[in-house]
A protein has these predicted regions:
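Conserved, well-ordered alpha-helix/loop/beta-strand core segments that scaffold catalytic motifs
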Residues: 1-30, 38
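Beta-lactam-recognizing serine transpeptidase/beta-lactamase-like catalytic domain environment
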Residues: 5, 38-143, 147-264
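Short, surface-exposed helix-loop/turn micro-motifs enriched in polar/charged residues
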Residues: 24-34, 160-162, 212
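Non-catalytic, structured segments within soluble enzyme domains
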Residues: 1, 31-34, 261-264
Length: 264
């Protein structure tokens, strides 16, 4: 058995991931991967909080167990934590009245329905057993700007001297029947005229929206496919998620916001 994991890198990743989770009050578990950029080999992979495989039924997140054991009404903070860990849709019906009941009920056919406590307990156990790195969909955020930039350069449609103007906001579908939406840069920043390197340095959302407009949906989507974002990674670990939030070329052509959101 040959593993690509480096125990020293793994230990460092787990230490700093735990520190970051505490600093930023992470609700939905943290994940981190370190890869060899030349081969794709995984040097470290961590999902926190962890659990003890010898005692998998115990919920190791003290905050979650405290919420689960409450007999009075849940606070807004409690509900926020549950939704952050399990997803809003997953818990909405269970905690609709704000109280976790330990009583079983029956459906219209007389079948027993597990108590809300038991349902949530099972969901929390399953959540801590999962390897978050591969079983959950991850929204890449601003790191995707590198994909947009690469598509522009490789296609020859743009070069590093390509400039676009950032005035701080861009409103689409204004006054139309379609969904009106205003895009901003982080913290309301206005970056003015920038080339590609400056836009990457500033993580300018509006520059990359205009870059995607220049590329057009068909070319942009071709590169999204070429980078492998429309298919599983093929990692030799079980239960890799097959969900995707990538809009195809037709969807990006039909709805401007689909193209713009994908760009940055």
């Amino acid at each position: 058995l040959n593993l690509t994991l480096d125990e020293n890198v793994q230990a460092i990743v787990e230490e700093y991931l735990a520190e970051a989770m505490e600093t930023f009050s992470v609700h939905g578990r943290g994940s981190a991967i370190v890869m060899n950029v030349k081969t794709g080999a995984i040097l470290a992979m961590a999902s926190l909080e962890q659990f003890d495989p010898n005692d998998p039924m115990t919920i190791y997140d003290d905050k979650m167990q405290t919420i689960l054991d409450k007999t009075d009404a849940l606070t807004a903070d409690d509900i926020d934590w549950l939704e952050g860990r399990l997803g809003e849709k997953n818990v909405a019906g269970i905690i609709a009245d704000g109280v976790i009941s330990q009583e079983t009920t029956e459906d219209e056919n007389g079948n027993t329905i597990s108590s809300e406590y038991t349902q949530l307990q099972g969901m929390l156990r399953e959540a801590q057993w999962k390897n978050k790195n591969i079983t959950e969909l991850y929204m890449p955020g601003s790191v995707f700007k590198l994909i947009t930039a690469s598509a522009g350069l490789d296609s020859g449609i743009m070069n590093m001297n390509q400039t676009f103007y950032c005035n701080g906001e861009l409103t689409v579908n204004q006054g139309s029947e379609l969904w009106e939406h205003t895009y901003h840069c982080a913290n309301g920043e206005v970056h003015n005229l920038q080339n590609m390197a400056q836009a990457l340095d500033n993580s300018c959302n509006l520059w990359f929206i205009q870059a995607a407009q220049t590329l057009q949906p068909t070319v942009f989507y071709d590169y999204i496919q070429a980078f492998g974002f429309t298919q599983p990674t093929g990692v030799d670990l079980p239960s890799e998620t097959r969900w995707t939030s990538v809009y195809n070329a037709e969807q990006m052509a039909e709805v401007d916001t689909n193209l713009y959101t994908a760009a940055f």
